[in-house]
Amino acid sequence: MKLLHLYEASLKRRPKTTNAIMTGALFGIGDVSAQLLFPTSKVNKGYDYKRTARAVIYGSLIFSFIGDKWYKILNNKIYMRNRPQYHWSNMVLRVAVDQLAFAPLGLPFYFTCMSIMEGRSFDVAKLKIKEQWWPTLLTNWAVWPLFQAINFSVVPLQHRLLAVNVVAIFWNTYLSYKNSKVMEKDKVPVHYPPVVE
């Protein structure tokens, strides 16, 4: 309980910073889990600290801000005006918009960001999307709608991103695994741009 009170106090004082730290940490935990549960020893020998750093950077500097904004949009803009905010019809509407708009666009965005941070070309990002988008989206639809229905029904707006991030430790483990899977299968080389002095 004390941790929750500390989190709430921090969220009130510095909401963006608190969300960034929590989201980055939980994305990092997801990647650590993925590397320990699904090692890619054929490509990389040992633990890949840079891969975890990329997950933390994506979570803290990119997803935390997008996720926070997205949940505010869903809460403040996506609802039936003639129904109370927490009416079941608004929950269904928010889950539908989340799963039919955010999820299909968020996955290619994630794979593209990861490819860029890995120093790879857009062709690699396209390959990841081609290979992983549809199966990952199907898994997303098997996992997230029920949780989001609960999230939109009972979790206060300021805690929705945290609720998603805690459950997303398992999802981020899966995403990190899927992101690395194409690289392991195809052994796509890293293409760094030339250094200009």
UniProtKB/Swiss-Prot annotation:
May be involved in cellular response to stress. Required to maintain mitochondrial DNA (mtDNA) integrity and stability. Required for ethanol metabolism and tolerance during heat shock. Present with 1870 molecules/cell in log phase SD medium. GO terms for biological process: ethanol metabolic process. Pfam families: Mpv17_PMP22. It is a multi-pass membrane protein. The keyword Mitochondrion applies. Keywords: Membrane, Mitochondrion, Mitochondrion inner membrane, Transmembrane, Transmembrane helix. Belongs to the peroxisomal membrane protein PXMP2/4 family. It is found in: Mitochondrion inner membrane. The keyword Membrane applies. Its main location: mitochondrion. This is Protein SYM1. GO terms for cellular component: cytoplasm; mitochondrial inner membrane; mitochondrion. The chain crosses the membrane at residues 20-40, 55-75, 97-117, 137-157. Changing residue 54 to Q: Almost abolishes function. PANTHER family: PEROXISOMAL MEMBRANE PROTEIN 2, PXMP2 MPV17, PROTEIN MPV17. The lineage of its organism: Eukaryota, Fungi, Dikarya, Ascomycota, Saccharomycotina.
